[in-house]
Design a protein with these regions (language model features):
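Extracytoplasmic strand-loop-helix segments at the start of, or within, the mature domains
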Residues: 138
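ATP-binding/phosphotransfer module of carbohydrate and carboxylate kinases, centering on a glycine-rich
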Residues: 1-62, 71-75, 95-103, 115-130, ...
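A charged helix-plus-loop insertion that forms the helical arch/lid used to bind
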Residues: 76-88
Length: 252
């Protein structure tokens, strides 16, 4: 291995996960501990949770962290599913101070997309590709010929009279007691809207529900235009951790 493993940390609306990553192969080389996202998810409380996970993994000389919001030059510009006090926060500075090593910060869906385009379902694909992460909310990452268009936040588009993630996120299926088929149709309609906007050749569906893609794939296939391929994420919900580590290693 030409480079030491790098710690990637994926901060979500409900949980924070971390692992050591072999960034040459895109593989986790440690356990993947998880802690509940503190509520309220303020910067200091989240940073403390991240530090607990990093300490448990033995630390690293450089660490990558994702956050669910728009990130520009290390500063959080919007806050989705975390406390509003993140807005305007120098997240790079916060995590670097808390952990005592250099840290990089990237939008969570962008991180997952980078990992899938490098090691997973999008590997070697040109044209327009979209990664959609379905969890507490909906995250997105858009790529053109393999190049990331950062901070798209397509889960915040208006869809059927409300914010899209309030209609079709994975958390909505549980909260509204939807069957997989009912929820799959919602996702299919949402993805169809994205095909109208971007005409992607590929849509990668990520998040924990990617493990159960076959439960709602037929509903998606019945709605999304045939010229757009829709596939589950190969890295499943490991993608955010791997992408965070890639960025920390300077490879994006």
């Amino acid at each position: 291995m030409g480079i030491h493993p790098v710690i990637g940390v994926d901060v979500g609306g409900s949980g924070v996960k971390a692992a050591l990553v072999d960034v040459e192969r895109g593989e986790l080389v440690s356990d993947r501990p998880r802690l509940e996202t503190p509520q309220p998810a303020t910067p200091d409380r989240v940073a403390h949770t991240v530090a607990q996970l990093v300490d448990g993994l033995g630390g690293s000389s450089v660490i990558g962290v994702t956050v669910p919001g728009v990130v520009s030059t290390g500063v959080v510009r919007t806050a989705a599913n975390i406390d509003s006090t993140w807005i305007g926060m120098d997240a790079c500075g916060l995590f670097s101070k808390q952990l005592g090593v250099p840290c990089t910060v990237i939008n969570d869906a962008d991180a997952a997309g980078l990992a899938e385009m490098r090691f997973g379902a999008g590997r070697g694909r040109d044209g327009v590709a979209i990664m959609v992460t379905l969890g507490t909310g909906i995250g997105s990452a858009v790529f053109v010929d393999g190049n990331l268009v950062p901070n798209t936040e397509l889960g915040h588009l208006e869809f059927k009279g409300q914010v899209a993630e309030h209609h079709a996120a994975a958390a909505v299926r549980k909260a509204q007691h939807l069957t997989w088929e009912q929820w799959g149709r919602r996702v299919g309609h949402y993805l169809t809207m994205l095909t109208t906007l971007f005409s992607p050749e590929l849509i990668v569906v990520g998040g924990g529900v990617s493990r159960k893609f076959d439960r709602f794939a037929d509903e998606i296939a019945a709605l999304v235009p045939i010229n757009t391929e829709v596939v589950p994420a190969a890295l499943q919900n490991r993608a955010g951790i791997v992408g965070a580590a890639l960025v920390a290693a300077g490879d994006r």
